[in-house]
Amino acid sequence: MSEDLAKQLASYKAQLQQVEAALSGNGENEDLLKLKKDLQEVIELTKDLLSTQPSETLASSDSFASTQPTHSWKVGDKCMAVWSEDGQCYEAEIEEIDEENGTAAITFAGYGNAEVTPLLNLKPVEEGRKAKEDSGNKPMSKKEMIAQQREYKKKKALKKAQRIKELEQEREDQKVKWQQFNNRAYSKNKKGQVKRSIFASPESVTGKVGVGTCGIADKPMTQYQDTSKYNVRHLMPQ
């Protein structure tokens, strides 16, 4: 599925580039502007579907860490961290620290779940507990945590399925609009006046293929006149 979405994303981006190129010469065309907006929207939807779990984890942790804390962590420290499965914070212990990438491997106390999370998302235990108390949250039991995890995954799957459906509909709409755009680009310039290629077959036996007509289609070519007698000697005074 990810491979298909990646191909679709590349196709949408290519179409957007062509629309932007067309707009450079006709920036007020409403159809092109609407098509550009729709393509940008479907590109964002596709990017969102291709987003990885770490990105979702970082986004879910925004409610837990509104500001980036500054704390010197070391292996064995207790902390409060966000669990990626439900977006809630729990007490954990730091098992390993990757200073280069700014991440820590942690294990949630009482549950045994291991996870790698950015150091900036960790909070001291007391500060984290106070934040949970202020928000009215109570520590969950393991059974409650598993049930919440199951419900979270179910909702996430339903939401993803709905977004995929919307994306497919957007793709079909864009396909039709893009075909209409291409058809207009090669259709007649004015009603009743069809634009013809200069390489089209002539309608009469005297017409020449590849010669611009400029309104004199099917007329004989202008006869060549020999002007060699008008050389420089005729211009010299006698």
Curated annotation (Swiss-Prot):
Detected at intermediate levels in skeletal muscle, and at low levels in heart and pancreas. Keywords: Acetylation, Apoptosis, mRNA processing, mRNA splicing, Nucleus, Phosphoprotein, Spliceosome. CDD domains: Tudor_SPF30. GO terms for biological process: apoptotic process; mRNA processing; RNA splicing, via transesterification reactions. InterPro entries: SMN_Tudor, Tudor. Residues 72-132 form the Tudor domain. The keyword Nucleus applies. The modification Phosphoserine is found at residue 201. It comes from the Eukaryota. It is found in: Nucleus speckle; Nucleus, Cajal body. The modification N6-acetyllysine is found at residue 219. A motif (Nuclear localization signal) lies at residues 142-160. GO terms for cellular component: Cajal body; cytoplasm; nuclear speck; nucleoplasm; nucleus; spliceosomal complex. One of its GO terms (molecular function) is RNA binding. Belongs to the SMN family. Associates with spliceosomes. Associates with U4/U5/U6 tri-snRNP and with U2 snRNP. Interacts (via Tudor domain) with SNRPD3 (via C-terminus); the interaction is direct. Involved in spliceosome assembly. The Tudor domain mediates association with dimethylarginines, which are common in snRNP proteins. This is Survival of motor neuron-related-splicing factor 30.
